């Protein structure tokens, strides 16, 4: 959660730093972005310094230390049980590869789309989505709304309700300040995924909490399979919005005849892909932690991140397809991969749920 709160502000900060380097320092667009990377590098160093400076304040929650005299009993598994669990985890890792390959197109083809195909300007209500402070206000309203219904005391309900009203008033005032159109740069789209993660987490918890109370909550493997289907739906939005568009190569050569589409296609896609991420990522890590044989838990958790790394490496497939192939075909490749992965998960479901 904290990671995504920071990620929400990062795109706006990067764009502002780049604009400062261009307008104030006089650097070209091709050179100005280096300043954003420089600030990111410095920020990482500062983050590490903060971590080590204040490490003593959270040392009590760090793992890896065993108290003197502590007798920790590990679950004993037969060789057959160990093999079944390892095989099940490897099957999940195989699916995870294709999810991250598709999901992390947000750093490649989806950004290409934002840069080359999406409209460069936005106006009206839509333009408000590109202001990070509007997104922060919506997040506050979501959490305040949940607090209003879940709080036990009248005072807490009142405070939560006032926060919702204050947020609505702020957004209304911001709308009155909208005039004309604003410029939209490709990097700013990266704020939508962390925004959706932070805003939708309480919604996700409420849904699955309600299902759990009714004893109808899907198992972790089923959630992963559903996540692959939802990811396919996200790219289906892109495929539908790309019908009839020029190929990226033709778009570059078209000049004034170039075709641009509404930013809403990307904004909607990021929403659906975030739902997929919420279904798959935390559930997958939880599944690995629960199913991994005790003596192999560290290795199996490493396997999850190896699968993530392989998926990130395969993101390049989108780059190979970008340029001369119709866009709807590019997105269809990821639709097919996600659907095949979901079918594979459902085919292996009994084996996966047996060890879960």
Predicted regions and their residues:
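A membrane-interface helix-boundary motif in multi-pass transporters
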Residues: 16-42, 217-222, 253, 257-261, ...
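Glycine-rich segments within core transmembrane alpha-helices of 12-TM secondary carriers
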Residues: 1-22, 36-47, 130-136, 193-202, ...
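Hydrophobic core of transmembrane alpha-helices in multi-pass small-molecule transporters
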Residues: 247-279
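Loop-to-transmembrane helix entry/capping segments in MFS-fold secondary transporters
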Residues: 1, 33, 183-184, 263-264, ...
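Intracellular loop-helix junctions on the cytosolic face of multi-pass helical membrane proteins
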Residues: 15-182, 204, 208-214, 352-356
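Hydrophobic positions within alpha-helical transmembrane segments
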Residues: 189, 269, 300, 304, ...
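Intracellular juxtamembrane helix-capping segments at the cytosolic ends
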Residues: 279-292
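Structural signature of the two symmetry-related core transmembrane helices
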Residues: 199, 219-237
């Amino acid at each position: 959660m904290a990671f995504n709160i920071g990620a929400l502000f990062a795109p706006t900060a990067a764009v502002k730093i780049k604009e400062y380097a261009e307008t104030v320092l006089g650097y070209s667009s091709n050179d100005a972005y280096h300043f954003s990377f420089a600030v990111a590098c410095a920020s990482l160093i500062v983050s590490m310094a903060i971590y080590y400076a204040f490490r003593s304040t959270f040392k009590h929650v760090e793992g890896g230390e065993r108290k003197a005299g502590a007798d920790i009993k590990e679950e004993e598994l037969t060789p057959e049980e160990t093999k079944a669990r390892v095989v099940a985890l490897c099957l999940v890792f195989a699916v995870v590869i294709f999810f991250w390959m598709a999901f992390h197109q947000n750093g490649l083809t989806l950004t290409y789309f934002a840069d080359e195909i999406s409209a460069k300007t936005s106006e009206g209500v839509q333009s408000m989505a590109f202001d990070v402070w509007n997104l922060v206000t919506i997040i506050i309203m979501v959490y305040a709304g949940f607090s209003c219904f879940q709080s036990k005391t009248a005072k807490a309900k009142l405070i939560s309700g006032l926060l919702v009203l204050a947020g609505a008033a702020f957004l209304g005032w911001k709308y009155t300040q909208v005039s004309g159109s604003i410029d939209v740069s490709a990097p700013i789209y990266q704020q939508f995924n962390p925004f959706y993660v932070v805003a939708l987490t309480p919604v996700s918890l409420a849904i699955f909490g309600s299902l759990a109370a009714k004893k109808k909550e899907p198992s972790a493997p089923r959630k992963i399979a559903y996540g692959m289907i939802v990811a396919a739906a996200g790219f289906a939005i892109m495929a539908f919005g790309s019908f009839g568009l020029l190929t990226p190569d033709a778009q570059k050569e078209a000049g004034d005849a170039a075709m641009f589409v509404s930013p809403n296609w990307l904004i909607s896609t990021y929403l659906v892909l975030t739902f997929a991420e919420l279904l798959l990522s935390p559930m997958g890590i939880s599944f690995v932690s629960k199913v991994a044989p005790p003596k192999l838990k560290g290795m199996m958790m490493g396997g999850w991140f190896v699968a993530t790394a392989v998926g990130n490496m395969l993101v390049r497939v989108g780059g190979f397809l970008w340029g001369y192939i119709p866009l709807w075909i590019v997105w269809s490749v990821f639709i097919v991969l996600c659907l095949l992965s979901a079918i594979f998960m459902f085919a292996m479901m009994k084996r996966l749920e047996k060890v879960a």
